[in-house]
């Protein structure tokens, strides 16, 4: 499985969000290396980390006029829905579904930061 690593390209220029994203990358790395025995608990903790990150981003969106807030929140909601669905499968013993969701999230996360989150950062610093 390809493992995401923190790189300078993932920074968006909002210190709190960059740190939150770095924490999420660390959490992705951690859960991707966990064996099947500990995967369920690690994956549950990872999903909580994603929920926290999204909640914090959505709080930032409320602080200033951000025209793409609704779309951005919808991206978060769809992603969380998929993660919760895969968590249900993991709880039934289908660890492979959780690992597959994690692999897809690696790809989604880098694109989300480069496009949607970077747009949020630009809107925040716009005059």
Task: Give the residues covered by each predicted segment.
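Small-residue-biased structural context
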Residues: 1-127
């Amino acid at each position: 499985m390809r493992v995401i690593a923190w790189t300078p390209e993932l920074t968006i220029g909002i210190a709190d969000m960059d740190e939150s994203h770095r924490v999420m990358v660390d959490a992705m790395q951690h859960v991707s290396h966990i064996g099947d025995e500990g995967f369920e608990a690690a994956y549950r903790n990872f999903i909580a980390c994603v929920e926290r990150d999204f909640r914090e981003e959505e709080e930032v969106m409320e602080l200033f006029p951000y025209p793409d807030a609704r779309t951005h929140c919808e991206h978060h909601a769809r992603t969380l829905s998929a993660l919760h669905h895969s968590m249900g499968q993991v709880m039934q013993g289908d660890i492979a579904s959780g690992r597959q969701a994690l692999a897809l999230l690696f790809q989604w996360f880098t694109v989300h930061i480069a496009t949607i989150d970077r747009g949020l950062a630009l809107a925040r610093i716009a005059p």
